[in-house]
């Protein structure tokens, strides 16, 4: 029986772990950006359905308040939807920015893997909540949960740095950067195609 030398076993494990990190990051970025082309239609649907959705009874007054913030010549439904979409994106990004230090400190204390598992499960739950949401309130909660659980991007970078030799670190970080680019290309394309297919 051939036994693989320990050094080769370790090298294979590191490569496998790096590939898993990249795959995890790619899936998260696709899930994050998939919604971009869908937001206008989603918001239009939720705004029109709010009157018949008890959970969204607060939405029409809130939409009227937001509409009042716009200049008088820019209070059309389309411009209202654009503004609300921007607010939703800001909420997600603000939460992501706010909780990233917490997830980073926690990963230093209990390890990268448990934090990656927690954040990945949280993101998966947010995507499921969004997929099955029947009201704007549920959709908003899914974005809040997603933003709060989006600390895995920093933890993935830290994990990649931990398992990479200093001489290879620039290349490894470049691979993560390329993953960001691929995720932000594939996500909107998949979202746009799914809207055309009425998924």
List each model region and its residues.
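Glycine-rich segments within core transmembrane alpha-helices of 12-TM secondary carriers
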Residues: 173-191, 195
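Extracellular/periplasmic helix-loop-helix junction of adjacent transmembrane segments
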Residues: 42-96
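Cytoplasmic helix-loop-helix junction between adjacent transmembrane helices
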Residues: 142-180
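Residue-level signature of mid-helix packing/kink "hotspots" within the transmembrane helices
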Residues: 89, 93-101, 151, 184-185
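Hydrophobic core of transmembrane alpha-helices in multi-pass small-molecule transporters
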Residues: 26, 126, 137-151
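Conserved MFS/SLC helix-loop-helix module at the cytosolic interface between two early adjacent transmembrane helices
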Residues: 97-134
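Pair of pore-lining "gating" transmembrane helices in MFS-fold secondary transporters
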Residues: 15-61
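Interfacial helix-cap and linker-helix signal at transmembrane-aqueous boundaries
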Residues: 43-44, 106-107, 190-198
